[in-house]
Structure formats: structure tokens, C-alpha cells
Amino acid sequence: MERIQGRIVRGIAGFYYVATERGIIECRARGKFRKDNIIPLVGDIAEVQLVNEKEGYILEILPRKNQLVRPPVANVDQAIIVFAISKPEINRVLLDKMIVVAEINKIEPVVCINKVDMEKREEVENLINVYRKIGYKAVGTSAVTGEGMEELKSYLKDKISFFAGPSGVGKSSLINLIQSNIRLKTGELSEKLGRGRHTTRSVEFLPLDFGGYVLDTPGFTALEIDIPKEELRNYFREFIEFQENCRFNSCLHVNEPDCAVTEAVDEGIIDRQRYISYLTLLREVKEKEKRRYKN
């Protein structure tokens, strides 16, 4: 029987729907997965043995480049981290925390500042420039006027992406603007996949007309920074070129003497709010380490 490769775009009730060059194949996983305690995830690249044109068995899951727990997905390329410039007010610490979590998971963060149709235009441009200067992709968007949508689409093209951010920032509105028929497409795909047979909620990658997939549920519902405190500084990209000039190799850039990073902050080379985010997250990581050692 013929074997082909594809990406799992949906999994529910023991069925896995694999997007291949032949279309969507409904698959079961071989018993060895249960035996080895391996659960196929949405996003996995799978080797499938065809039973007929529409059905098959998953024989093998190829190595994952990353994996998230909530939502349970694998092999994501990028996180579109959405914050509104106002209503709700932007939380820079949370924004920077999401960037760190993305990079820990080997996911490229894309900063998206939404609701730019509101006032604060100068603030939006300054904020976008902060992140672009560091080396991140950053875009200002409006779900009302459509501003920035073409640039956002260019970042999504041929990538496996999910949207993350607080509630009320306009993630769903942006997804629906990216592709006007995405709800219809979801319905069509669900029909093909037989969603009517199952009532359990599942995660699903939705295909984009211009190439790529977007996850139908927000990512990063669990925001854990689970790294040693000494490693956090390496996830603030703008620190790296200065760190080697600190007096101490172990410098955490808090109140150590001759710290090149704090000097760069004082000179306005490193954005002060980014540095404040770092200090806040460092305290959080230290507290987590303390609790771990107590237990």
C-alpha cells in the first residue's frame, strides 16, 4: 500500500486529519503510538499509509521542531503577538513575556499593535520602531480600516502561525480580515473532516489561500518561563552585544558594578521599558526557583 507524508491539521476522538498533496486524509494512529505513549499533535508531520483515497493509518511522526502544551500543537513557525495600543491599554511586560516564551519554544515572534485607527499614532510608531530596531518583525494594524493587513499577510505567507495576546485586542477580527472567507473555509473543512460526527472541541489549522496555515484558537494560554535565571538575559536580544563588556560574566544586569547593559539603558541605547520588563520577569523566574527549591 502507498505511503505519503502530510501535516496533521486536526485531531479529535482518535481521528487525525492529514493535509497531503492528495487532499485531506482521515487517519487512525497505529497501536504502537499508544504502546509508546506518543500522542500525535496538530501540526505534526506524519507518514501515512493509504487504505483508500480518503483514509489511511499514521505510521510515523517525524521529529518535532517545537511543541506547545496549551494549545497542544507542534511545529509552529511563528506567533503573531497582538496587543491593542489602547482599550485595553498595552501591557509591555506581558508583551515582552510572550516574546520570551516564543523564543524559548523556538517560535519566531511577530509583534502586532492593533487598533491603530485610534489616536496615539506617534506612540504606535515609536513602539513598532523599538521592536524593529531589536530585530523583530513588527506591524501596526487596524481591523476597522484594514491598515497594515497586507504587511501582516506577507508575514503569514507559507508559515504555520498562531495568534496570541490578551482578550479584547482584536485577534479574531484580524483573522477574519486576513481572509474574508476563512469562516466559510472552516465550515467547508469541517464538513470534509466530518465535524458533525464529533462534539468534542478540537484545535485546527486553517488553510490560507495565499499559502500557510493559521491556528483557529489563541496560542500561549499557558505562559510559563521555565529556564534558569542566568539564561533570561539571552532572550533579550539587544542585551547580547553589551553583555560581553560587563565586568562579570555572570552579570544579571541588576545592580552589579560596571554593567554594560545598565549603562546602555542609561544612555538611551536600550529601551528602558524593555529593561523594566526584563527586571520584572527576572524576579518572576527567581521566585519560581525559590518555590522549586522549597518543595
Swiss-Prot record:
Residues 65-223 form the CP-type G domain. Binds 1 zinc ion per subunit. GO terms for molecular function: GTP binding; GTPase activity; metal ion binding; rRNA binding. Its EC number is 3.6.1.-. It is an enzyme of class 3 (hydrolase). It is found in: Cytoplasm. GTP binds at N114, K115, V116, D117, G165, P166, S167, G168, V169, G170, K171, S172, S173. PROSITE patterns: ENGC_GTPASE (PS50936), G_CP (PS51721). Its cofactor is Zn(2+). The keyword Acyltransferase does not apply. One of several proteins that assist in the late maturation steps of the functional core of the 30S ribosomal subunit. Helps release RbfA from mature subunits. May play a role in the assembly of ribosomal proteins into the subunit. Circularly permuted GTPase that catalyzes slow GTP hydrolysis, GTPase activity is stimulated by the 30S ribosomal subunit. HAMAP family: GTPase_RsgA. This is Small ribosomal subunit biogenesis GTPase RsgA.
